[in-house]
Amino acid sequence: MYTFKVETDLKAFDSFLEENGGQYIQCSAWQNVKTTWKCTYYCGFEGEKRVLAVLVMERSLPVAGKIWYASGGAVCDYSNTELLREFTDFMKEEMKKGGATCFIMDPSVSLRINGEDQASGHEMHKTLTDLGYELNPSIENYTYKQPVQLFIPLFEGDTQLTADKILKKCDKGVRYSIRIGEQRGLVAESYTYEDVEKNPQIMDDFMAVMRDTSERDSFVERNGDYCTKLLREFMGHSDLKLVYYDKDIDEKLQAERLQKKEKALAEMKTAHEKKARQLKETIDSVDKQTEHYEKRMAEAEEFTKDRRICVAGGLSIYYAGMGSCLFGGTRNVIRNNTRSSHYLNYLRLCESVKRGCKIHDLGYVIVKTPELQEDGTLGELIPQDNFKGIYDFKKSFSADYHEFIGEYILVGNSLKYYSYAKLMPTAKKAKIKAIKMLRR
């Protein structure tokens, strides 16, 4: 027998999340980010022991009424069917008292990992549907999260992996792309909320990165105020990394390469055959790098006369053992020449390792709505065409592709809920269209 109540001790609520694999979207700081939602905190107890915690956000909509949503679901032992049953009964009563149209949650329970079925995911689908939840089969209508994420494990057993050891699992091309960043004039800075407050140009640079990225990959980026709010509310658990192309540094590196070539040319005059071949390789390598350098400088000069250009950036949150890459991208300048996206993501991975995280979360990709399987679960979740490249990039870092069980709805008022379900796609499209028109 379990008891449930509205939780007012948010410190205890957050402590439970941190100790039991909760996510930043489930903690009390999230209400200060999602200010258009009304937040209520619930906890479940077995005697005096806290065994469940859930942040329920409420939004009132015309026609649809009150929509309740728990991002990431409840933090609890999902294999405990009795706990889930009693929690569901409790939520049904709360919905009646609050006049809620529905309660939506999307538990981070994997249905497939790298394409392999997970029995626990199929069992969870059956448990939830037996308890009265309905699976939302239309991915494009999901409330907030896509039902996929790409994770890089940072531990093997009790041993933390180094960033270099993780990279050994990646393709050779990934390791090469990371290495050449610093060799071609890239430098990075890590900023906090305080830094952004003192120097607004930092956020302006990041927004320029995100605008280029969103236009290139056909999505709508968050604005600077929202990103600043995330840094503020997760102060001490967040950072903003910006990667710059520094022309002065690149010029210095090129001068060093040319000196190396001159030395090789001088030694060639007296070198024996084997040594001469090695020197020839050095000279050819410098010539090739010089060609890249000249293209880089020409492209950068055409883009701006500034000596330092922000070419990439990423905002991350580190919470409860997970380093989450929320937003990130690159400018449309010297992207391929410097491999700035690889360099940025390597730095973000290093930060997660440095902070002792167990998982590095590369985030989600937008997926297509699948056919349902025979047991009623979601079929294979395939990235939309404009996100295929992003998916391939994230997978190249040896990330595991988790397909979650999806979004489940407990319906309180059928008429209002199905009106909401019918109107939501139209409302989402109208919102995106309006944002794009305003930005043009």
Where are these regions (language model features)?
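Short, basic, helix/turn surface patches
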Residues: K165-C170, S218-R222, D400, K429-R440
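Aromatic-rich peripheral "rim/lid" segments of glycoside hydrolase catalytic domains that contact
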Residues: F393, D400, E407, K416-Y417, ...
